[in-house]
């Protein structure tokens, strides 16, 4: 076995230390360290199991409600950590009938649960939520929930990551049966993790309540909000042209001018773009929250700026 050069090993160690120092701040035994809490939020169907990442420091903090998809195998905790590092509280939760939360699962229950969690944030006096700086971030079916939740006036901006516009399943079937079949397969597979529902029942609900569930139904209030939509050219689950573009067009038709869209050569879970997507999301929300000044005109160029359309 070839021995590694000790000088090279030391150099690699120093490089690692430098990267850690750039990315991570160590707080030691300060009075208000970053922390993590498991929270049970009372919902209309019982307990909503939630996790809260709190940022360092006294006082209130800008807050992100992070919404996972269906069934939620990808919960984007790395994104939660990235947002906390720059000063956000991040609250994520499991929908009714999902991953231990009480009740039965349904698409309309997802929307109601998100409203319940937002109301919890607005009424809480314990954890230091800044009630004037609340944002929503959602991935996949969580992007659908995020879009609907961001219509609430208390939400100041939103981020949709590979969103699933579940209310458009019928229209998508007319445009691409292959894409629609993929959504049906996801619903069927996801039902194994969900209480009180089948894939067929979810599909029926999506079609029966399509007008209420489609993201375009929220276009008018969303036209007044800063919104970032990130899609992937290799995403075969929720291709942006079927799931994101119709919402963007509807918002623009309502006069919306606060949209940003990004597209990367990656899959539905942005598996090889995790750090890039996290950087783009944090940069977008930092600017909205006033944590950092706008990048425009600074003389430096964001890694996220190249793909903005």
What does each model-identified segment do?
Residues 17-58:
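N-terminal cap/lid segment of alpha/beta-hydrolase-fold proteins
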Residues 60-69:
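Short beta-strand element of the alpha/beta-hydrolase
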Residues 69-81:
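The serine-hydrolase catalytic nucleophile loop
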Residues 71, 98-131:
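Catalytic nucleophile-loop/oxyanion-hole region of alpha/beta-hydrolase
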Residues 84-100:
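Conserved alpha/beta-hydrolase
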Residues 123-127, 131-180:
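Primarily recognizes the serine-hydrolase "nucleophile elbow" in alpha/beta-hydrolase
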Residues 155-157, 161-258, 262-271, 277-278, ...:
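The alpha/beta-hydrolase serine catalytic core
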Residues 264, 270-309:
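Catalytic active-site module of serine/aspartate enzymes centered on a nucleophile-bearing elbow/loop
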């Amino acid at each position: 076995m070839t021995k590694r050069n000790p000088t090279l090993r030391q150099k690699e160690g120093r490089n690692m230390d430098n990267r850690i120092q750039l990315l991570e701040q160590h707080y030691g035994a300060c009075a208000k360290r970053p922390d993590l809490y498991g929270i049970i939020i009372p919902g209309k169907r019982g307990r909503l199991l939630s996790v809260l990442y709190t940022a360092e420091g006294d006082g209130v903090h800008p807050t992100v409600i992070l919404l996972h998809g269906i069934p939620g195998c990808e919960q984007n905790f790395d994104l939660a950590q990235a947002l906390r590092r720059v000063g956000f509280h991040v609250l994520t939760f499991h929908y009714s009938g999902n991953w231990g939360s009480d009740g039965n699962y349904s698409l309309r229950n997802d929307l109601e649960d998100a409203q319940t969690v937002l109301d919890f944030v607005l009424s809480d006096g314990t954890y230091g939520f800044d009630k004037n700086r609340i944002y929503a971030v959602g991935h996949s079916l969580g992007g659908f929930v995020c879009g609907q939740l961001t219509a609430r006036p208390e939400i100041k901006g939103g981020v949709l990551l590979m969103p699933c516009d579940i209310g458009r399943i019928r229209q998508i079937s007319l445009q691409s049966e292959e894409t629609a079949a993929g959504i049906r397969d996801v619903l069927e597979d996801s039902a194994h993790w969900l209480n009180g529902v089948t894939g067929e029942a979810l599909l029926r609900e999506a079609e029966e309540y399509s007008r209420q569930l489609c993201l375009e139904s929220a276009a008018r209030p969303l036209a007044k909000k800063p919104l970032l939509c990130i899609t992937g050219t290799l995403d075969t689950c929720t291709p942006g042209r079927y799931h994101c573009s119709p919402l963007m067009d509807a918002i623009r038709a309502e006069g919306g001018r606060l949209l940003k869209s990004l597209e990367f050569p990656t899959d539905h879970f942005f598996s090889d773009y995790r750090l890039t997507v996290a950087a783009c999301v944090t940069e977008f929300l930092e600017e909205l929250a006033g944590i950092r000044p706008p990048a425009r005109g600074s003389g430096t160029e964001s890694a996220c700026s190249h793909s903005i359309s």
